[in-house]
């Protein structure tokens, strides 16, 4: 039965801007990194190109994209008041919420993959138009982006939880934007590895302990948040 709910959620994406967002966000990062590289007066160090892109993605574009994505997915139901019918169906509540969570995580993975592909296309383009040093390490970049995706699961679930809980789009926007800017301000803080919006950023840390803490809390914590969201939302009335 769950696969039917997931399929319905995927079909609903055609009516929203979610797919456009998932294409535009990684593309913006890849384009910006390419423009910055071509604007250099010195040779481009290809070994750090992927790290620069991953940092820009983890610090700002990914958390803001997750915020917007959670709002878009929730407003597909809140806007036309679809909850009033869907949530009255027997056993529908946990399945609907779980399907939305799975689709959102799938879209996050798709954005990570698209960014990886675009960076692999940008690297030879930069090398053909500008002097470069070193080589683009596709394997390292892919691994970093994959770990960032796992570490971002907790933020995804928190954002989706708030977006589904409130009919207004303001609370999830405040949470996402506030969390992103708080992460930027607390980047060098000792407790940064425990802050959800910094967990993906910590995949760039030289300290392996910080990376391990962030990916463990981000991944496992995301599953715990998902379970808590399903229990909470399944026991309450349609979002007010």
Predicted feature locations:
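Transmembrane helix-loop junction
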Residues: 76, 89, 124, 128, ...
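Transmembrane helix boundary and interhelical loop/hinge segments in multi-pass membrane proteins
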Residues: 68-85
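Short loop-to-helix capping motifs
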Residues: 15-17, 92, 167-169
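Short helix-to-coil transition segments within interhelical loops
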Residues: 87-93
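Secretory targeting signals
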Residues: 30-66, 70, 98-166, 207-209, ...
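Hydrophobic alpha-helical transmembrane segments of multi-pass membrane transport/permease proteins
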Residues: 15-39, 55-69, 173-187
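Terminal transmembrane helical anchor/hairpin motif
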Residues: 32-52, 173-240
């Amino acid at each position: 039965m769950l696969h039917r709910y997931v399929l319905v959620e995927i079909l609903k994406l055609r009516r929203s801007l979610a797919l456009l967002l998932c294409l535009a966000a990684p593309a913006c990062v890849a384009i910006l990194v390419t423009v910055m590289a071509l604007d250099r007066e010195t040779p481009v160090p290809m070994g750090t190109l992927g790290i620069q892109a991953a940092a820009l993605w983890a610090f700002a574009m990914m958390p803001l994209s997750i915020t917007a994505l959670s709002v878009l997915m929730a407003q597909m139901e809140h806007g036309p008041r679809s909850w009033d019918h869907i949530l009255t169906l027997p056993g529908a509540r946990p399945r609907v919420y779980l399907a939305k969570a799975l689709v959102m995580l799938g879209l996050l993975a798709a954005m990570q993959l698209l960014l990886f592909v675009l960076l692999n296309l940008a690297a030879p383009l930069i090398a053909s138009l500008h002097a470069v040093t070193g080589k683009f390490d596709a394997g390292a970049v892919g691994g970093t982006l994959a770990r960032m995706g796992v570490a971002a699961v907790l933020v995804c679930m928190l954002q989706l939880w708030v977006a589904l809980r409130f009919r207004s789009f303001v609370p999830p926007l405040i949470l996402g934007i506030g969390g992103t800017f708080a992460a930027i301000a607390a980047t060098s803080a000792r407790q940064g590895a425990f802050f959800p919006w910094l967990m993906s950023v910590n995949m760039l840390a030289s300290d392996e302990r910080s990376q391990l803490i962030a990916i463990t809390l981000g991944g496992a914590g995301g599953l715990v948040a998902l379970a808590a969201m399903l229990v909470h939302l399944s026991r309450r009335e349609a979002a007010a």
